[in-house]
Every structure is written in C-alpha cells, then in structure tokens.
C-alpha cells in the first residue's frame, strides 16, 4: 500500500470499501462458486495423483486423455467435494477440476485444477480451510468480486486468459447474488463485474534485472542494502532514490504499452525524471569534493548574506539568503594546477567568477607534506561585485561554493546503475548477473551544503547546482546530520560510454 501511495494514486480498495482486499476474504464465495460449477456439470472431483495428471494431460503436440473419474455424477461430485471441505481426505489425494476439453490446443484448458486438498495453517483463516482454490480460479473471481473492469497483466498470462474468461462466465457472479451473500452478511457491500484480462509486455530496462528471483537473491545475499536500496528497480528503491511519481508517469507515457517484448534504455527513465525535477526542484549550493579557497583581500571576520533565486526559471519559488565569508569550499575539480586544453575554471594566476559574488584570481596554491592541495589563496576583484562598475566584466568560467563558516557537513551518496553491462541477464559468456555488479554503483562522499539544503525535510528534492539532482534520504537524513542521495546527474553521463 505504501508503494502505491508513493505513486500518488489512491490506496487500493476492494468493492467492499476495505483498505486492502485479500483472497482469503472470499474463501466462502469461492467454495460456493465451486459447488455451482459442480451442479452445472462443468466440474468434477478427480482422484488422479499429480504424476498421473501430468501423464493424462498430454503435450503441446499430443492431446490429453480424459480422467477415469471425469464422468462421476453431480451428486457424487458434490458429496466428495463437501467431504474435501470437511477435511476427510489427505493432502494431494483429490482435486476439483474444471471439465473443459482435454484435447484443447491450449494446455491450460485441459481440465485445470480449481481446488486441492492442503491441510496447512493459513495466516488469515487459521485452520478453517483444508482445501484451497488454485490461482486462476481465485484470481478471476477476486477480480469480479472487486468490481475490476480490466485486469492488466504481463504476456506470460496470455495463455491463461481463456481459463480466466471461462471461470468468470461460468460462475457469473454478477447475476448470482446468493454466491456473494456472505460478504453482504459481513457488512461488505459488493457489486461484482465481468472483468476483462488484457496482457502487455513487461517493462524491461537495461543495466538492471527485473526477475523477482534475482532481486530476492540480491537482497538475501546482501549484494544490495535491502528492497529499498536506491539501486533496486522496486517502487521502494526508486522512491528512496528520489525518482518522482510524475517523472515515472512521464516515462511510461513516452514508452507506451505494447505486446512486443523489448528492453528500454535506462537513460529514457532517467531523462524523464530529470525533466520533471528541472521544473520542480529548488536550487541549492553544495560541495562534495571540497578544497578550501581563501579570499585574502577581505577581512577574516567579513560575513554577509547574499540573495539567490531558488529557481532560475520560476520566480514563484522565491529567493533565499546565502551566507558568504572569505573562507569558502569549492569543488576540487574546479581547480587545475596544470589545466588541460579547454579548461575554463580556476588555475594558478587565472580568474574565475564565484557564483553570485564576483571574480577571483588564484595567487597562491598551498600544499601539505604529501603534495596534496589544501588551500587556494585568491584575491577578489571588488569592482566585479554585483552593482559595481565591473560587474559585467567577462570571464569564461563560473563556479559554485559554500561558505566554510556556515557550511553544514553532509554525507552524500552517489548512486549509479547497479550493473556495468547493458544486459546482466545474458550469461552466454559463462558469467551470471552477480558477476556484473557495478563496483561504482554506490559511492559515499563527505561534503558541505549551505544551511538551506541542510534544513530540508526527508524526501525533499533539490538540484545541487552544477552537480545533479539530490534527495534528502527518507531514513537517515536530519537537519543536523544531513544525508543526500543522488537522484540523477544533470546530463546522461553514460551516453559517452555507450
């Protein structure tokens, strides 16, 4: 339910109005429906073992054979089924089967089982039922009871649709209120429908696996951090990653629904989320690989508040105060001692514009005993500040910063694609999907954020300027100890690699 609510749709409700429906709520209705099928002469109790059933069923190229118990009378079948309900028979000794066509080309129609004897404790009904309905029978009737009009499922259920329709048509709940009277008696008003099953292709994405079995393995073997690991293709996972419901809906609008199995590029999903966040996420300043920059021609005690827009394209987001002081944190990659060709950020004796402040020139590079750069000493061109005559002076690069005096230390998790190959399901090279887990899919760094970012509520999304879109972690983030997950980069960083 929480996953569905995260998609900003209504919490699931049955036609009874219950917050969540369970098949076990309908066990009495299923039982009455089975009795009806027996009375109609289209269901019978079979004594064949599971192995014998497989033998009699036939193959894709050979028709099946009728069970020797197929022609039992209605009275005998009613008696046997009621005794099954009473718990007189051992597990697996009898089944209730639909009487359809043992020569049908669709094997699902070769007298499928509707009920079996299974004396197990049920989490909702306890030991009340020694028999349980089979999936196809329970699924179709549950849809009808819940007023479902269209039951959507993936292509592997296409061959099951004729059986789905058979169950719905033969039981005909909509015109037989006596069958669902137990729900009414329990105060659960019900308006059955005649549902239609529609199949579509599974939404496969590259760089991930969608198999439930493989996802369970990833969790059980601690290859990920649980079902809500932001790298997992689960609702809980993409929610914690920070993907928006609107972004996911935009993605599905773009790729559409089809019956053709295909694999969708992960960049399409990320692009839809990125597009949504571009218009919805306020901007904040953060530095995730910090090096200190000291402005030497300002008094060490200098401190002021600058006004920044929360969104460059939407004035309705308002403005905020950003503290500024002579000691700043900037990104380490925004300085190059020996700059490559085309580098337009800070370098020795070079100039760059500090976002919202003015132009600084790097005068001195301070290193530690290991040769690691620890500090950049710069002078600020005071004439280049906002409102001054030189404010429009042009330099090629602009970089962001965070005031060291006011910065809040933050943990930043940089998530990427879980696998390093486009099709981790492909095992033709002798490797399994577990061999292709991307070792760089989760990287944790420690940086600094401006106070407005630190004060975000859990699951608040924002753009860290020049870095990407981030979300305050739904479990670990607090204003005093902020934790952010990267949702997506500002651009498709995989495009150059593929």
Where are the predicted features?
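Short hydrophobic "helix-edge" motifs at membrane interfaces and signal-peptide entry regions
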Residues: 125-127, 232-235, 456
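Basic, alpha-helical terminal appendages of large translation-related enzymes
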Residues: 1, 7, 13-21, 25-28, ...
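Long, charged, mostly alpha-helical binding arms that flank functional sites
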Residues: 193-272
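Short, compositionally biased low-complexity segments
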Residues: 1, 52-58, 134-140, 220, ...
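Generic alpha-helical structural element
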Residues: 26, 70, 87, 127, ...
């Amino acid at each position: 339910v929480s996953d569905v609510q995260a998609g900003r749709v209504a919490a699931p409700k049955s036609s009874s109005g219950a917050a969540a429906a369970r098949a076990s709520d309908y066990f009495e209705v299923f039982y009455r429906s089975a009795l009806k099928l027996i009375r109609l002469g289209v269901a019978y109790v079979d004594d064949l073992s599971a192995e014998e059933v497989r033998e009699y069923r036939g193959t894709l190229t050979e028709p099946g054979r009728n069970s020797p118990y197929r022609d039992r009378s209605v009275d005998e079948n009613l008696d046997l089924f009621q005794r099954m309900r009473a718990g007189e028979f051992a597990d697996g000794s009898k089944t209730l089967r639909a009487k359809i066509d043992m020569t049908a080309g669709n094997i699902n129609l070769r007298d499928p089982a509707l009920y079996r004897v299974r004396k197990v404790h049920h989490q909702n009904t306890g030991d009340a039922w020694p028999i349980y309905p089979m999936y196809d029978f329970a699924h179709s009737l549950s849809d009808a009871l819940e007023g479902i009009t269209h039951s959507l499922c993936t292509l592997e259920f296409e061959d099951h649709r004729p059986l789905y329709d058979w169950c719905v048509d033969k039981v005909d709940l909509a015109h037989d209120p006596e069958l669902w009277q137990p729900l009414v008696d329990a105060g659960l008003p019900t308006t059955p429908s005649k549902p239609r099953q529609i199949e579509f292709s599974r939404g496969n994405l590259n760089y991930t696996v969608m198999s439930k079995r493989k996802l369970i393995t990833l969790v059980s073997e601690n290859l990920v951090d649980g079902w809500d690991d932001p790298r997992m293709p689960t609702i809980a996972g993409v929610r914690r990653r920070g993907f928006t419901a609107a972004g996911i809906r935009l993605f599905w609008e773009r790729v559409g629904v089809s019956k053709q199995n295909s694999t969708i590029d992960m960049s399409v999903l990320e692009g839809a989320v990125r597009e949504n966040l571009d218009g919805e996420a306020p901007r904040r300043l953060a530095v995730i690989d910090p090096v200190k920059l000291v402005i030497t021609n300002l008094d060490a005690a200098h401190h002021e508040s600058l006004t920044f827009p929360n969104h460059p394209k939407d004035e309705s987001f308002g403005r905020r105060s950003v503290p500024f002081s002579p000691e700043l944190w900037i990104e380490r990659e925004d300085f190059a001692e020996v700059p490559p060709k085309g580098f337009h950020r800070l370098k020795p004796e070079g100039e760059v514009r500090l976002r919202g402040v003015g132009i600084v020139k790097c005068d001195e590079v301070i290193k530690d005993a290991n040769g690691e750069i620890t500090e950049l000493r710069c002078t600020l061109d005071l004439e280049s500040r906002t409102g001054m005559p030189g404010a429009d002076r042009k330099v090629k690069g602009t970089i962001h910063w965070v005031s060291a005096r006011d910065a809040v230390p933050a943990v930043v998790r940089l998530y990427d694609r879980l696998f390093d190959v486009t099709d981790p399901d492909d095992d033709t090279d002798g490797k399994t999907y577990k061999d292709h887990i991307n070792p760089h899919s989760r990287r944790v760094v420690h940086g600094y954020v401006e106070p407005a970012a630190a004060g975000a509520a859990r699951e608040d999304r924002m753009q860290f300027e020049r870095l990407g879109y981030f979300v305050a972690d739904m479990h670990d983030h607090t204003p005093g100890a902020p934790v952010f997950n990267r949702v997506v980069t500002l651009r498709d960083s995989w495009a150059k690699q593929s």
